[in-house]
Each structure stands twice: as structure tokens, then as C-alpha cells.
Amino acid sequence: MRNSTKQEDLVKAFKALLKEEKFSSQSEIVHALQDEGFENINQSKVSRMLTKFGAVRTRNAKMEMVYCLPAELGVPTTSSPLKNLVLDVDYNDAVVVIHTSPGAAQLIARLLDSLGKSEGILGTIAGDDTIFTTPARGFSVKQLYEAILVLFEQEL
């Protein structure tokens, strides 16, 4: 029982540190956790935790590349840092193309898919850093493009 409490404390401390959005390397996270009293933490454990909790590297408000956690599981929202993961949005006659930070496309596509047809999204296809989005019936590609710009607070 004591061991699971220690594990829960480690997870809480780990998540709290990542919410600060100031750690650019795994070794920085290791040292911060050691400072919090977790002496047995090492880089491989931090690496496994980053993977387990879906942490991504993105730019913080100071434009530094840092580790952060996406919104909690469930339907993601567009609150920071997700909107910071969208780098560019463009369109042609058929689709809206969204470029994201590496590794972020599937997370952003999941958000868009959760909005659904009522918001103009028929569906998405996501790679590592690129998303193709097609409009639902009754919506033009340009309308979808403009809605996505507003959603991620990009310039019109």
C-alpha cells in the first residue's frame, strides 16, 4: 500500500512539474524530481512516464522548446498548449491542411474530429505533423478554413 502511495506522489509531482512548462530535457526533469525527494528516479523512468502520459515537446510562452502534457484524456480542448502546436493552416479547393509541431497532428485531429459535422468537419487524416481536413456537406472549404483559424486563434 505504501508503495502505491509513493507512486501516486511521484505521478502528481511529475505532472505538476510538466505543467510549469519550463523543462527542456529529461535530465532537468530527473533533477527536479530528485529535489522533490524522489531519490530513486532516473532518466529511463522519466522517459517511460513521458510516454505513458503522452507528453510532447512544444514551445512555451517564451518560445522555448519544453515538455508539456496535453489536456487530460477525454476530449481535448483548444486551451494552451494545444493551440501552440498548430504552426500553419492553409487550404485548396478540396481540403484544409494543418501543419503542427512534430508528433502533434493526431492530437489536434482528435480535437477536430470531436467537433464533428455540426461544426463543418466531415473528417480528418493525420500523419506525424500534417492533417488533412475535409468539410461536411453544406460547408465550403473556405468556411472550414476560417473556422479552424478562429478555433486555434490564428490570423485570418
Swiss-Prot record:
- Name the GO terms of the biological process aspect: L-arginine biosynthetic process; protein complex oligomerization; regulation of arginine biosynthetic process
Q: Please give the Pfam families that the UniProt record associates with this protein.
A: Arg_repressor, Arg_repressor_C
| Functional pathway | Amino-acid biosynthesis; L-arginine biosynthesis [regulation]
Cellular location of this protein?
Cytoplasm
Question: Which keywords annotate this record?
Answer: Amino-acid biosynthesis, Arginine biosynthesis, Cytoplasm, DNA-binding, Repressor, Transcription, Transcription regulation
- Taxonomic superkingdom: Bacteria
Q: Which residues form a coiled coil?
A: none
Provide one Gene Ontology cellular component: cytoplasm
Q: Which GO terms describe its molecular function?
A: arginine binding; DNA binding; DNA-binding transcription factor activity
Similarity remark: Belongs to the ArgR family.
Function field: Regulates arginine biosynthesis genes.
The entry's protein name is Arginine repressor
Q: Which organism is it from?
A: Pectobacterium atrosepticum (strain SCRI 1043 / ATCC BAA-672) (Erwinia carotovora subsp. atroseptica)
Q: Lineage from the top down?
A: Bacteria, Pseudomonadati, Pseudomonadota, Gammaproteobacteria, Enterobacterales
